[in-house]
From Swiss-Prot:
Species for this entry: Saccharomyces cerevisiae (strain ATCC 204508 / S288c)
Gene name of the encoded protein: TY2B-OR1
Domain Integrase catalytic: 656-831
Comp. bias regions, Low complexity: 369-381
Reaction catalyzed: DNA(n) + a 2'-deoxyribonucleoside 5'-triphosphate = DNA(n+1) + diphosphate; Endonucleolytic cleavage to 5'-phosphomonoester
Site positions for Cleavage: H397, N398, N578, N579, A1232, A1233
Listed name of the protein: Transposon Ty2-OR1 Gag-Pol polyprotein
Amino acid sequence: MESQQLSQNSPTFHGSAYASVTSKEVPSNQDPLAVSASNLPEFDRDSTKVNSQQETTPGTSAVPENHHHVSPQPASVPPPQNGQYQQHGMMTPNKAMASNWAHYQQPSMMTCSHYQTSPAYYQPDPHYPLPQYIPPLSTSSPDPIGSQDQHSEVPQAKTKVRNNVLPPHTLTSEENFSTWVKFYIRFLKNSNLGDIIPNDQGEIKRQMTYEEHAYIYNTFQAFAPFHLLPTWVKQILEINYSDILTVLCKSVSKMQTNNQELKDWIALANLEYNGSTSADTFEITVSTIIQRLKENNINVSDRLACQLILKGLSGDFKYLRNQYRTKTNMKLSQLFAEIQLIYDENKIMNLNKPSQYKQHSEYKNVSRTSPNTTNTKVTTRNYHRTNSSKPRAAKAHNIATSSKFSRVNNDHINESTVSSQYLSDDNELSLGQQQKESKPTRTIDSNDELPDHLLIDSGASQTLVRSAHYLHHATPNSEINIVDAQKQDIPINAIGNLHFNFQNGTKTSIKALHTPNIAYDLLSLSELANQNITACFTRNTLERSDGTVLAPIVKHGDFYWLSKKYLIPSHISKLTINNVNKSKSVNKYPYPLIHRMLGHANFRSIQKSLKKNAVTYLKESDIEWSNASTYQCPDCLIGKSTKHRHVKGSRLKYQESYEPFQYLHTDIFGPVHHLPKSAPSYFISFTDEKTRFQWVYPLHDRREESILNVFTSILAFIKNQFNARVLVIQMDRGSEYTNKTLHKFFTNRGITACYTTTADSRAHGVAERLNRTLLNDCRTLLHCSGLPNHLWFSAVEFSTIIRNSLVSPKNDKSARQHAGLAGLDITTILPFGQPVIVNNHNPDSKIHPRGIPGYALHPSRNSYGYIIYLPSLKKTVDTTNYVILQNKQTKLDQFDYDTLTFDDDLNRLTAHNQSFIEQNETEQSYDQNTESDHDYQSEIEINSDPLVNDFSSQSLNPLQLDKEPVQKVRAPKEVDADISEYNILPSTIRSRTPHIINKESTEMGGTIESDTTSPRHSSTFTARNQKRPGSPNDMIDLTSQDRVNYGLENIKTTRLGGTEEPYIQRNSDTNIKYRTTNSTPSIDDRSSNSESTTPIISIETKAACDNTPSIDTDPPEYRSSDHATPNIMPDKSSKNVTADSILDDLPLPDLTHQSPTDTSDVSKDIPHIHSRQTNSSLGGMDDSNVLTTTKSKKRSLEDNETEIEVSRDTWNNKNMRSLEPPRSKKRINLIAAIKGVKSIKPVRTTLRYDEAITYNKDNKEKDRYVEAYHKEISQLLKMNTWDTNKYYDRNDIDPKKVINSMFIFNKKRDGTHKARFVARGDIQHPDTYDSDMQSNTVHHYALMTSLSIALDNDYYITQLDISSAYLYADIKEELYIRPPPHLGLNDKLLRLRKSLYGLKQSGANWYETIKSYLINCCDMQEVRGWSCVFKNSQVTICLFVDDMILFSKDLNANKKIITTLKKQYDTKIINLGEGDNEIQYDILGLEIKYQRSKYMKLGMEKSLTEKLPKLNVPLNPKGKKLRAPGQPGHYIDQDELEIDEDEYKEKVHEMQKLIGLASYVGYKFRFDLLYYINTLAQHILFPSRQVLDMTYELIQFMWDTRDKQLIWHKNKPTKPDNKLVAISDASYGNQPYYKSQIGNIFLLNGKVIGGKSTKASLTCTSTTEAEIHAVSEAIPLLNNLSHLVQELNKKPIIKGLLTDSRSTISIIKSTNEEKFRNRFFGTKAMRLRDEVSGNNLYVYYIETNKNIADVMTKPLPIKTFKLLTNKWIH
């Protein structure tokens, strides 16, 4: 009990005085473990200095008063007799008093007179004072124990008398025992007992007395509780309870051992090697250190040793760092081998020719202490170390052996101990004679060698002797070769054993080698260790493992020696052994070196190349080939690693072990991209191992439920149809097969799931080969038939039917025959894609045709009918009511099979199945819930975008056009039902007449460029682009080459079906002009940029036809009474609204004034445009809108296109690519990539826990994140985020209700570091939240509108922040979350009480909470239609999650709101906004400078300066600045992009990061960049080099203009009304797929508050339609902004809309209700009329060169761009 009490209170016994003493006890450069009895005086010299300077009395303490010091109560300390120590030999209190020993009190409080203490230990007096120091022993001791009669011979302790002795602290743990012993020994020394303490050898200076022994025993017992002693100490004390000195002796020995360990660690950590010494020497040094540590039970792993070695490599060896940097399984032997090879290679490179051996007389021997002075040549050998994970014995410092035995290492001889002599002649040695071998001449001191002794070498792996006198069982050597460190051969004469007879009669035997050419006889400790014999260099003895001493060893010079007297002579008389000649491999290069020098080439390749003299200066005989064929290069094994080879026919045993349908193979193929949603994207296949019967099932996704349904169906089918049970299913390791659902399904049905090994697809060959076969058939069938892609699974289904019916080359029966089924009835099969006519039993009218053209796909699974595809109805049907269409070729026509016909053959095969069309057709519905795998084909929904042609950029002279033969190619697509049969079926009638057509169109007019179409495009294009004659956007078809030459008289047009229309007479006012132009070459055209003569037709029309709507360009005030005027607002100010009042104060460019009401003909003086028509300069597609007369590239086909003519090659290369297996290269199609872009993926700006804390190398930043982490935890607990009263077990909670959590970290814009504990809402189950709830934030337009009104009305702007806003909202659902990591509750869950960040419902919950509080407690009302905008009579609030922006005329009103908020929420004032000077804000990323009554500036300079350089974009801060984000004339190449998968993902990620930041900036305030951002965003999935360069150019422009700001000035006070204006513009057909770009800019009182640039959702057919689309997009937002302005500011409002399209204005204002050109055009126009008249909207014309919305729709020249933007952003 006492020892336990002392242990608990020991840290505070000694207070500050103790700390002051121990702080000096070990100097900084002294190892604290290097303590022994011999150096204790020096060790304690400083530790007791303080004690010697302080005097204490028994009743006082020398410790300064310390509030941390707690003195234990004496009465509470029981005596130690109750412990486990034995109490024998203890003195009674009477004896103690008789011997004048003082009372032995509590150890830390003892008081004693000098040397008058008693060993007695009994209960102290409770009232006895307890000082904290012990007086030392100072008088001479009594008689020693057991030597009373020799008292005079015992040396007396003579020490300096000291006032106090610092007692040791109490032992607190078993691990601290070695440290505690140091203090205890010091305590004994200070108590004048240092001369009786044994050293590490167990030696003492004098014997201790009985009293001293009792004193040591009692103090040791008091300060070292028995239960805290190490095991080895307990074992000693259990034998002899008082043997404290033995414990101290072994402790001191362990200290010195630990000191050696520390030195070894330091040496290992500071290793350095640069090749200046031999690689063997370095290896031996390292191995010795590691072996020594291992002997001390410290194992150094190969990985750690390699890392320490690599750190110290330099010179030519430094490159090994990079080689081993990424290796995880590093072997020390491999690293040494690499170092040796580099060392050998450097040696060879320093020599001019292969070395030759010199005569032995030219060599000199050297000792260990003198360097080798010989200039011996180096000869490399086949030096290879076996790569083994087993520990190797330490190698000798001076030898290396090469043996046929695997256990003998091929080591080296150190030049310091082995002579380099070479025996030139064979000699014979008589083993029974005295040694007479010639000793080498050595340049060493005669005192270096100890005669008749063996040198003990701790690094030697073999024992070498110079004399055969001691060699037993000697045999001639023919296997072992020894070379020195210079690779010179050392002959070995014989191999035998050395027999030892040690002191105690112990005999042992070790293996030894005989050679006369060494300097010393070497004894290997490794060989001795194999016999359980070790050397103790501290006691200088050879010992057994049990501690038995066998023989002493002698230290002579620098080495340890063993006398030869322990060797037993051999007594062999005359046995002779032939000496061994030098190795045949001398002078030969090792194969590993040559293998490495020749780039790790194959063994046979190297050997053959040398035979053929392909490599000069090196012969085949110069290389050691002995082990070359079996040599394993580690680098080759890693770099050339391949999968194991599968043996052919290895699966035959499964066919013998299983019956049919018991062993199935399955695999999933997909996805197939760019298909309608109703078509499957995957299929799953099954193959029976025994019969090879195949099944395929379509899949729309790879979800668990879908896969499970298929497995249920196939198992039921096999069980019912074949009466078999599936036993094994083999599959790969895809997640669709390894999920828990499917595993449970297999387990319940007793099916064995057999998975392939990792990355071993060849083991799944049956299923993989089936998929490949089916896809090959699919591609072939679709290509041959020309059917659309969405029917791809029908082709797979047809192939499966055929493959099951045919005999494979390896089987004698088909799969159907193996399964016991009848053969395939050929009369029931039609060619895939065979044209047929299907009876329509339910026509729309009695007079409509009853037959519908279709294409046969495959026999039905569910009936005796056939699955037929009907393009006109966009669906497939299962019917028997069809007739094969005669004389209708399929795509075989393209192979010039015109002379072949299959009609007779088909009639003969299907004669008995042909019948009249009857009313028994069964139409398949997609929604039918059947098990048929063709249900997906029914009612396929296809988008109905109009067909658009693809043209080339070349312009050729019509006179040079030759008629091109037409290839009849059919691609049946969905066609309107009312189109004639000729438009649906493959037609041989193709127009061969080229067209000349104009596609140039601008709002100011254009020219018609002479061009021709490819014959394969003519008919389709004419039908699609037919227009009424005389319409403003007519395009004249020149259908005859001759008519182009002689004028436009009698022009003939061609319909789709090939019929002709009446001639169109040439207008008399139309003039044709031919011009010579420089045609702009396309990006794809690399042939020439020279001038070409191209006819440019300029058509000047003076009168328009009467069948089009009239264009009224007059504003309302100038129109006649025949025209209706829009409704005007009834207030007085509205009566004076004019175009000038609308245009007034707008930031328009300063140009020559032109009246906005100018009605002059805009088509006058139209300049001729000599360049070809292309898409937009930035983001447009080259050559997409221009007709060509040469081979044009066919764009990707859409599933909804009508019949078109395509090239077979392009069909196969582009449209079928999605059906090909995965490739190493990824092909990206521009159109598909653009259509695939849905939105810009946000780039992660936060850090995970491991990134912010665990692996963060920035300690300062790490500390800040740790601080933020603890702050977040405290806030979570403060807010009662979860229920802390109960923890729930994970197994008891529904997994759907469990939410994963994580910590995210980020650095805020103000520099503070923030941590946030969030829920993984991205994987939250849908049942745990209400999807109807919405998380609202303030719209950016609402914020900009509020800021604009604040500037005009001198409002105060206050910025607030609510800390942990979401945590104020309660959560309604029952959800559980995993605890934070610091709690350590991995298997527990917490019940959520608050809306944690990240949950789907948290945003909505917080919105409802704060909304309710603002309305009920702050008297606010939310503005209708604008979420998160609240107002009352004085204050307006814009809410963005936890940020609040307050606007008020009176600052006190803002303060009142703040006071109310603080009652409920932790509200921080970011910026109160008081004062009349300029105030700076950071509001939602916008850096705002605001001075009331004057101006407001909005920018992001600081943010962009920080973020842009981190994007890894090559910015040029000192170079020439860009003046525009892009230039006209740059075209994005539409060629497919071929790129590696990894590189593609990397570039897409880079595009997302760059465009994400640019989009954020653009929509905040840089509206001038929105066009470029929107266009590049469409190409995120097409990261070509060109797209990336344009993106870099945009980022560079943002960097150059990062200081630009959106400038607002206060509105003139004379303006009584608010004026809200939208400026609209459109660019016709300049985007991919002929889409138009539309843009709008919104201004409030002359201040730009928003902008929008986007691609039109529908394809417009003219410039006017595009402009109407742009206006229709602007009006709804204009009306919503108008409502917001009226709510926030009660002034009257004037709404205006400006456009530069006079035709659009005319259509809006016209009352003519004549039928429009098409339905879309008419509905849009009529809707605009209603919106303009119903919303009091003023529509006026703005000149194009003043239309600032022009920057939203197209790239502009630098001058124009600056002119349109410098008024509002600068």
